[in-house]
């Protein structure tokens, strides 16, 4: 399999996973979020929580957990997307912008999809949060790519200097 095909399959698979999570009804989605909060707090506190404590922790953490999930999910999508686009062209500003646009369009389609799922809603603020996550993922990939390129350049310079020193001896 070529690199392009593997990266394309990763992007499509990640988008499918986002779609599956978005297709959960409001009740199922709430149970998953609440379960993550309760299990995490019981693990951290090293004890079982009372029902009152569970409700308290859920009320404190449900928004950060759910919005954090958006950021992480779209961070990964952005990272995968720019990695895929790199296979089709040289990296320049247009490639980064195109990756961001594709992630935003997918986020919008995801929120429209959620609008039609029972107990869910499509939220503009979630598109904004998804966009932040995508931009962070794309930036992270770009930063790593730039560091790899700099390392390659430094290695070439070192090799040239070694040759010059060797030739001068």
Model-inferred region functions:
Residues 71-87, 132-148:
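Membrane-interfacial alpha-helical segments at the cytosolic side of multi-pass membrane proteins
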Residues 107-131:
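Interfacial helix-loop-helix junctions of multi-pass membrane proteins
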Residues 149-169:
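Membrane-interfacial, low-structure loops and terminal tails that flank and connect transmembrane helices
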């Amino acid at each position: 399999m070529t690199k392009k095909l593997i990266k394309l399959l990763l992007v499509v698979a990640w988008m499918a996973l986002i779609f599956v999570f978005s297709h959960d009804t409001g009740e199922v989605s709430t149970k998953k979020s609440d379960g993550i909060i309760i299990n995490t707090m019981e693990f951290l506190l090293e004890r079982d929580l009372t029902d009152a404590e569970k409700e308290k922790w859920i009320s404190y953490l449900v928004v950060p957990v759910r919005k954090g999930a958006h950021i992480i999910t779209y961070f990964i999508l952005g990272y995968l997307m720019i990695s895929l686009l790199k296979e089709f062209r040289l990296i320049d500003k247009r490639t980064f912008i195109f990756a961001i646009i594709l992630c935003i369009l997918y986020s919008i389609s995801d929120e429209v999809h959620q609008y039609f799922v029972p107990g869910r809603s499509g939220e503009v603020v979630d598109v904004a949060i998804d966009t932040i996550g995508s931009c962070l993922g794309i930036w992270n990939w770009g930063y790593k790519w730039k560091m790899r390129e700099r390392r390659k350049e430094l290695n070439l310079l070192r090799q040239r200097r070694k040759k010059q020193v060797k030739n001068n001896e």
